[in-house]
Each structure stands twice: as C-alpha cells, then as structure tokens.
UniProtKB/Swiss-Prot annotation:
A Pfam cross-reference name: ATP-synt
Gene: atpG
Protein name as annotated: ATP synthase gamma chain
PANTHER family linked to this entry: ATP SYNTHASE GAMMA CHAIN, ATP SYNTHASE SUBUNIT GAMMA, MITOCHONDRIAL
S-S bridge residues: none
Organism listed in the record: Rickettsia peacockii (strain Rustic)
C-alpha cells in the first residue's frame, strides 16, 4: 500500500509541474507574438537608417574629418569590444549555450593573437557564465528588463560610442540569436563598428528583419555607387535617389548614432523573440514529457493495484478452501 501512495504522490507532483510548464509555454507564445509585432513595426526605421548609411558610404571616406573617419577605420593596438546578449532567466533550452560557446571560442582566438578584449554583457545568464573565467575583461553588465526598454538600448549605445570616440577600441562586435521560428534560433555575430564600405546594407527580410553583417561580406555584394539605394517596403520595390549633401560637422556622427542605435535595437528584439521561442519550445517539450511520464506512472499504479487485488483474491480463495 505504501508503494501505491508513493505513486499517487508522484503522479500528483508531475501533474502540478505539467500545469506550470503549460502555463509558461502559453506565456512565452504570447510574448513572442508581441515581440514579432515590435520587430515588424521597427522595420521602416531600420530600413531608413540602412538606406541613409548606404548613401553616406558612396562618398570618399577620406573626404571626412579625422574625427569622422574613426567610425570607418580600425584603430590599431586597441581592444576588441564584444557585446554579448543572453537571457535574464533560464528554462530556454540551448538559447544561451550557443552564444556563450561562440564568445569563448572568439576570446580564446583573440588571446592567442595577443589582442586586448572588452566585454559588455547583457543578461544575467551570460554574466554568470563568463564572469569566473573572464572577469577582468568585463567592462559593463546590464540586466535585461522584463519588457523591451529603450533606456537599455541607449545605455549600451552610449558605452559603444564613448569607447569609439575616445579611441579605446579597434572594433565592436555584437553576439545575439536571430529569430527564425519558434524552434530555430540562429547564433549571429555582427560587426557594428568600424562600418565597412562595400557591403549590402539592406536590413529587411519580411516578416522578420534580416540584417546583413557589416564587415562580413556576403556573396554577390557589390560596392555602392551613384548614391542610390533600393527600398522594399510592404511589397513595394523602387529605386530611391538620395540627394546627399555633406553639410554640418555633426552630420556623420548623428547618422552613426542612429545606425548604432538601430543595430542594438534590432539585436535586442531578435534576441528577445529567440528567447521566448526557445522557452516556448522547451516548455512544450517539458509538457509532453510530463504527459508521457504521467501515462507511465498511471499504468504502473494500475498494475500495482491489480497485483494487490489478485494477491488478496488468491488469499481469500486459499482460505475458503482450507475451511
């Protein structure tokens, strides 16, 4: 009888856990849908900044001032700034593992070359995974708020811009998971600065933003010339001729600010969508596993009860025969 009690207790416990995982699955599905909507709403802004950047890069970089050229040139013998985006909470499968693994591999490679490293970590899980081994490299750590927060985006941007303007870093690379669907997240390493001239700066691949890596040349990419770019917004494809005039000493700096801002915003939204997709999938799998375990435990309970009843019947029959 004690065995039956243990089985009933375990079944009750698994059912309780199943309710929690099911609720978390539904919450993550709802959050993911909202974030996908935010991504869609931000497409126009990201596309506009992308087109302006393409137009700017049609000019000769050496026509710019020394202060402006630093956004397009690598500063030798300075630190590599790595921005790592992970989750604040767990229970999201391998979401953080792929990012942390890639960051560790890149840090090891940079160390072997004798290069300097700075880390900006966003998300508690990434900080916990990297602080023991690379605490001396960590420049800043930001906790990830429960909802998409522009203040976080601005703080990270200010850190990047300050480091670049003060010539503290040679380049800036961001690590995040790009959202493909609820079951698939693509680990992405994206160079933000210095901005590479000969790249396709199109960022949009509806319904989810697809940002071509600045600094990572894509097959078939061609130099941008004639100060022209292509706009593909809401199914419409047309050529836009930018009448770009270089005026104002802060023009390039302001555009770079917008560009870095859009890159971070894009990465944060993609990372959040990927996190909720990974968590939804993980909780769905946990719910299904709980259901399978409950079925096995119920079967075991029924067999145990049947064995007890059979034993009691045999004892009753044996007793009646003895009488």
């Amino acid at each position: 009888m004690s065995n039956l009690k243990q089985l009933r207790t375990r079944i009750k416990s698994v059912k309780s856990t199943q309710k929690i995982t099911k609720a978390m699955q539904l919450v993550s599905a709802s959050k993911m849908a909202k974030i996908k909507s935010q991504i869609a709403n931000s497409n126009f802004y990201i596309e506009a900044v992308s087109k302006m950047m393409s137009a700017i890069l049609s000019i000769d970089i050496y026509e710019l001032s020394i202060e402006e050229q630093k956004f397009f040139n690598t500063v030798p013998n300075k630190a590599n700034l790595l921005i790592v985006m992970t989750s604040q909470r767990g229970l999201c499968g391998t979401f953080n593992y792929s990012i942390i693994k890639q960051v560790k591999n890149d840090i090891k490679e940079l160390e072997n070359k004798g290069e300097q490293i700075k880390l900006i970590i966003i998300g508690k899980k990434g900080y916990e995974a990297l602080k023991r081994q690379y605490v001396n490299y960590i420049d800043s750590y930001f906790e990830l708020p429960k909802i998409h927060d522009e203040n976080l985006m601005l703080q990270v941007k200010q850190k990047i811009m300050s480091a670049v303007e003060n010539l503290e870093v040679s380049n800036c690379v961001i690590y995040f998971n790009k959202f493909k669907n609820a079951m698939t997240q693509i680990m992405t390493r994206q160079q933000i600065l210095p901005v590479a001239k000969y790249q396709d700066h199109s960022m949009i691949d509806n319904p989810i933003v697809n940002l071509v890596g600045f600094g990572y040349k894509e097959r078939g990419a061609k130099p941008i010339n004639n100060r022209r770019a292509t706009s593909d917004i809401v199914g419409e494809s047309k050529s836009i001729d930018y009448n770009y005039e270089y005026e104002g000493e802060n023009l390039i700096s302001n555009l770079i600010n917008l560009y870095v801002n859009s890159q971070i915003n894009y990465a944060l939204l993609q990372s959040r969508a990927s996190e909720e997709g990974a968590r939804m999938t993980a909780m769905e799998n946990a719910t299904n596993n709980a259901n399978d375990l409950i079925s096995k435990l119920v079967l075991k309970l029924n067999r145990s009860r049947q064995a007890i009843i059979t034993t009691e019947l045999i004892e009753i029959i044996a007793g009646s025969e003895a009488v």
